[in-house]
């Protein structure tokens, strides 16, 4: 097995692991690497949808998107399709996927089928480092606080893409989560807020909440917390 770091903050390209192998032993290797590097990238993995589902099941219960229809045969798989003339980018702002759900999602598995000749890169940011480097003043303000996450940030994308079909639901879903979470496997503290879905910190007045969130959002975007991945097919 070969590990190539994407950046100093997070991310590793992994060679020598076959994602078609959905055995518990293979999953444990992947999970251990994920806990260490936060984001993993595998090249030339021509897996089927069924094999993707089999791998995903090891991480926990599968989820469906609340606004966009999944595939008919595999409804947990959401197709992200952008036609050449469409200008908006799916997930174009910094976010934590579906953080408005009642329980934080452990893993998102993305598989590239067809990619543009230029552009389309995805960036990831390490929220463990983001918390560690947060000022003591902000830490003291948010360590014991919860924040509201709203799905309306995702609803804005519904029907924006002609190849992606909404399921007819535009209701708002919201849940509160700790601003600072302790990862259940590593025991490390991480920031669990994001500019797309987090709307307000509870038990703070609206202005103070807005000021603190905006400061955190800017902090999260520091390039030295990030890695950038250029997709290729499979």
Label every model-predicted segment:
Residues 1-233:
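Non-heme Fe(II) oxygenase catalytic core, chiefly the N-lobe of the double-stranded beta-helix
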């Amino acid at each position: 097995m070969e590990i190539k770091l994407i950046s100093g903050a997070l991310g590793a390209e992994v060679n020598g692991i076959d994602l078609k192998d959905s055995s518990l032993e293979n999953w444990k290797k992947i999970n251990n690497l994920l806990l260490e590097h936060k984001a993993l990238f595998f090249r030339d993995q021509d897996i089927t949808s069924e094999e993707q589902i089999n791998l995903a099941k090891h991480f926990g219960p599968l989820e469906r998107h609340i606004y966009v229809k999944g595939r008919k045969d595999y409804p947990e798989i959401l197709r992200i399709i952008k036609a050449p003339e469409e200008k908006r980018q799916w997930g174009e702002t910094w976010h934590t996927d579906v953080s408005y759900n009642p329980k934080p999602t452990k893993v998102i598995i993305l598989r590239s089928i067809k990619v543009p000749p230029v552009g389309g890169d995805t960036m990831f940011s390490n929220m463990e480092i983001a918390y560690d480097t947060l000022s003591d003043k902000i830490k003291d303000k948010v360590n014991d606080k919860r924040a509201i996450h709203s799905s309306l940030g995702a609803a804005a994308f519904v029907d924006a893409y002609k190849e992606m079909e909404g399921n007819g639901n535009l209701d708002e879903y919201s849940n509160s989560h700790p601003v600072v979470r302790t990862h259940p496997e590593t025991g490390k503290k991480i920031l669990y807020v994001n500019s797309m879905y987090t709307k307000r910190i509870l038990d703070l007045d609206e202005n103070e909440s807005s000021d603190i969130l905006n400061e955190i959002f800017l902090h999260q975007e520091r390039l030295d917390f990030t890695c950038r991945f250029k997709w290729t097919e499979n």
